[in-house]
Amino acid sequence: MGLGRCIWEGWTLESEALRRDMGTWLLACICICTCVCLGVSVTGEGQGPRSRTFTCLTNNILRIDCHWSAPELGQGSSPWLLFTSNQAPGGTHKCILRGSECTVVLPPEAVLVPSDNFTITFHHCMSGREQVSLVDPEYLPRRHVKLDPPSDLQSNISSGHCILTWSISPALEPMTTLLSYELAFKKQEEAWEQAQHRDHIVGVTWLILEAFELDPGFIHEARLRVQMATLEDDVVEEERYTGQWSEWSQPVCFQAPQRQGPLIPPWGWPGNTLVAVSIFLLLTGPTYLLFKLSPRVKRIFYQNVPSPAMFFQPLYSVHNGNFQTWMGAHGAGVLLSQDCAGTPQGALEPCVQEATALLTCGPARPWKSVALEEEQEGPGTRLPGNLSSEDVLPAGCTEWRVQTLAYLPQEDWAPTSLTRPAPPDSEGSRSSSSSSSSNNNNYCALGCYGGWHLSALPGNTQSSGPIPALACGLSCDHQGLETQQGVAWVLAGHCQRPGLHEDLQGMLLPSVLSKARSWTF
């Protein structure tokens, strides 16, 4: 009896264990079959075949909208989505599907922030049992943003433009700089597909439409939508928002303003003035720089302009700035005025007093006067003081390099010789004093020579040694002179400056003068 009882109890315990194992395996098979029939995946990262059919978007405030693209379940099923916060334990929000959509409204204390993170699961009942599927283990609301469309869109027509204004939710006002808008406007009778668009409107709640953008005389419509602006690349990931455009706002109608005629200033368009000024500067600028900075161009254009530097050079290099001495050294010959032409013999003296002496000096070899040449022909025609031409003209006038003109008043004249030189002819020949009476031409000749002589000229008593002298010979012939035609006059003068004496002597007018004068300076 004892042995049979033990065997019976062993079979009973084994049967109970087997039944428990069979029940566990049967329950597992039922769950697997149910999940396969419903098509819901329970894979950990939301990679199941049906998890991607859910799309949940947030308005970034307190609302989350979800859409399910799977076929609807039977009438007896009531699916829902459960949002479980990964940061606040126990924080769950249920979104019941109505057809293929559902909306969950969060409580005011659970307003969405960029750091929010949720786990989404799908729940439904099957044969009296609740079935659970994992949709998204880490749902970030800031990555799925679809804002509400702008509200209260209004228009304000003014002269030449139209101003559009709109409003946003007060909860989004702190994020105004992160909002980007797009405007669409068209004529009222046109379709929205033909509307004009203006985008990249960031951080503002108003916009201006110019009159030239609209068709005058037509009624236009405008509407607006918004999305989160694309931030720079240097923004941290926790503050970056992504999403899609909101729905279009309600359109607003307005009358297009009239276009105003272009205001043209009296001088024309500003662009034309700018072009004219630019061309003027391009033409005058290089020319100014060319003349201002190029000495070679200056020399080319101004090479024919005479310079008085050579004329005044002896004033400082020879006479040490003494203007009176310099003027005396640059004496000039006799120059009769036009009133003396054809003057009778009795009225000749006033004209002679107007005469001036022209002093000339050659650069290398002096020109010999007629009086000096006659000195070489005869012994009776030598200069006063028994000076020969060698004593008067030793080396020529080399002190001055150019011929100069000056006018010297004739005050005093002194007769020194009765020999009158002959007038110069065109062939360079010289005639004797005896043929002067047959010459019908009036003439006046003056020669100037610089040199050294040992004795002073008449009237010069300031120096007994060798002094520099400038001899001037002047002879004039006039038809109908007095009988003393052979008498000549010598101009003797003396100029003195520190370290240097200059004497003037020469042959002057014949004895038509009523008196003899000597002029010393």
From Swiss-Prot:
Membrane topology, Extracellular segments: 41-270
Entry GO MF terms: interleukin-9 binding; interleukin-9 receptor activity
Transmembrane annotation, as ranges: 271-291
A cellular component annotation (GO) from this entry: external side of plasma membrane
Compartments where found: Cell membrane; Secreted
Residue numbers covered by motif Box 1 motif: 301-309
Residue ranges, compositional bias (Low complexity): 429-439
Motif (WSXWS motif): 245-249
Entry's free-text remark on domains: The WSXWS motif appears to be necessary for proper protein folding and thereby efficient intracellular transport and cell-surface receptor binding.
Function: Plays an important role in the immune response against parasites by acting as a receptor of IL9.
More details: The gene coding for this protein is located in the pseudoautosomal region 2 (PAR2) of X and Y chromosomes.
Protein name as annotated: Interleukin-9 receptor
Native source species: Homo sapiens (Human)
Gene, per the UniProt record: IL9R
